[in-house]
């Protein structure tokens, strides 16, 4: 009898707990909160289906006036990945990624005139989608910047034969993680200001 009472109380307790809102149980929120920058890879290949999913996720991003002013340079050639790593040591392309994806702004698709630089916002949103998709699929990735350093951007343009209207925003190495970086809580209440700066 005592055992039955204990089991009943445990069941009631579990039911009560399960009714409490738990944000981290939401898969999308959990992916956002647990994403980390992965800089070391095993060298294993990823499948075409995985690569397709990454690029579809990137292109699902919002863009100003729905211009979608982006292009994605997908580098799978090992020699070219190594060359990127040599030219851009911070890019982590020497750390055995399966692929290096370079999100770019396509100025021929950008909003004309004074709003042309909105492509930076748009391609940044696409890049974040790419990072989140990689994490959700059990892959690792890291955002390594090029733009607005036009010397770096120009170097990549020349290395990959990109036309002048295709501006590389960053290099994103993607692969099977060889490390598990610590998940950090970056939330800081002092960064929040309601109804103005107070």
Show where each model-derived region lies.
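Acidic, surface-exposed loops and disordered segments
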Residues: 16-198
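Bacterial Sec-dependent N-terminal signal peptides
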Residues: 1-24
């Amino acid at each position: 009898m005592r055992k039955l009472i204990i089991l009943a109380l445990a069941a009631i307790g579990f039911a009560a707990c399960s009714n409490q809102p738990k944000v981290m149980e939401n898969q999308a929120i959990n992916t956002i909160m647990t994403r980390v920058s992965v800089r070391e890879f095993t060298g294993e290949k990823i499948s075409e289906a995985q690569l397709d999913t990454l690029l579809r996720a990137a292109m699902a991003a919002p863009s100003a006036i729905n211009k979608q002013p982006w292009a994605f340079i997908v580098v799978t050639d090992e020699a070219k990945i190594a060359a990127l790593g040599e030219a851009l040591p911070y890019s982590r392309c020497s750390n055995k990624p399966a692929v290096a994806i370079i999100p770019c702004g396509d100025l021929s698709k950008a909003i004309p005139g004074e709003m042309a630089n909105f492509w930076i916002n748009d391609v940044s949103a696409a890049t974040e989608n790419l990072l989140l998709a990689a994490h959700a699929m059990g892959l690792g990735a890291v955002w390594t910047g090029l733009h607005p350093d036009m010397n770096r951007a120009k170097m990549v343009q020349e290395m990959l034969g990109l036309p002048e209207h295709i501006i590389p925003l960053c290099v994103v190495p993607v692969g099977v993680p060889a490390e598990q970086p610590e998940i950090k809580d970056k939330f800081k209440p002092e960064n929040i200001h309601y109804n103005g700066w107070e």
